[in-house]
Structures are given as structure tokens and as C-alpha cells.
From Swiss-Prot:
The gene is hfq. The keyword Acetylation does not apply. It comes from Leptospira interrogans serogroup Icterohaemorrhagiae serovar Lai (strain 56601). This is RNA-binding protein Hfq. The lineage of its organism: Bacteria, Pseudomonadati, Spirochaetota, Spirochaetia, Leptospirales. Keywords: RNA-binding, Stress response. GO terms for biological process: regulation of DNA-templated transcription; regulation of RNA stability; regulation of translation, ncRNA-mediated. One of its GO terms (molecular function) is RNA binding. PANTHER family: RNA-BINDING PROTEIN HFQ.
Length: 85
């Protein structure tokens, strides 16, 4: 991964490392619930009840984590530094 990850990669990587449950809504409205096993630029591997699904990102509408994921962004860091300085 590059030095500067995008928000999508940060969210998915945090969910994967912390083994968080996600609900992924597809464009047709179908919800998929599970944990992220792996992901790349085009797909997400989701594990649900000891089964794995390969989900294409272009078919995803919304991703909702079971709990709030704190994302680190350069913009947030710059805003914090400006407030302190």
C-alpha cells in the first residue's frame, strides 16, 4: 500500500485487522454481513458463517461497520495541529 492510504482502504484495513463485523449493502439492496478477510482495488473477501464471498466493489452501495472506526487522515491531523498551534 502507498504511504497515503485512502479512506476506503483505511476503513477496510481497520475492519480486517480488528475483525469487526460489517454490513455491506449491494446496489440491488441485498445486505451482506460478515468480516473482511482481504481486499484489493476491485474486490472484498467477506467471511460469513464459515463461508467466504468475493464481492466486487462496483456492486457495493454502502458499508456499515458494527461500531465506529476511527480514521486517521492528514486533513484531521492538520486541523488538530492548527488548533493547538
Amino acid at each position: 500500500m502507498s504511504a497515503k492510504n485512502n479512506i476506503q482502504d483505511q476503513l477496510l484495513n481497520t475492519a480486517r485487522k480488528d475483525k469487526l463485523d460489517l454490513t455491506i449493502y449491494l446496489l440491488n439492496g441485498v445486505p451482506l454481513k460478515g468480516k473482511v478477510v482481504s481486499f484489493d482495488n476491485f474486490t472484498i473477501v467477506l467471511e460469513q458463517e464459515n463461508k467466504q464471498s468475493l464481492v466486487y466493489k462496483h456492486a457495493i452501495s454502502t458499508i456499515i461497520p458494527a461500531k465506529i472506526i476511527k480514521l486517521y487522515t492528514e486533513e484531521a491531523k492538520d486541523n488538530k495541529d492548527a488548533a493547538q498551534g
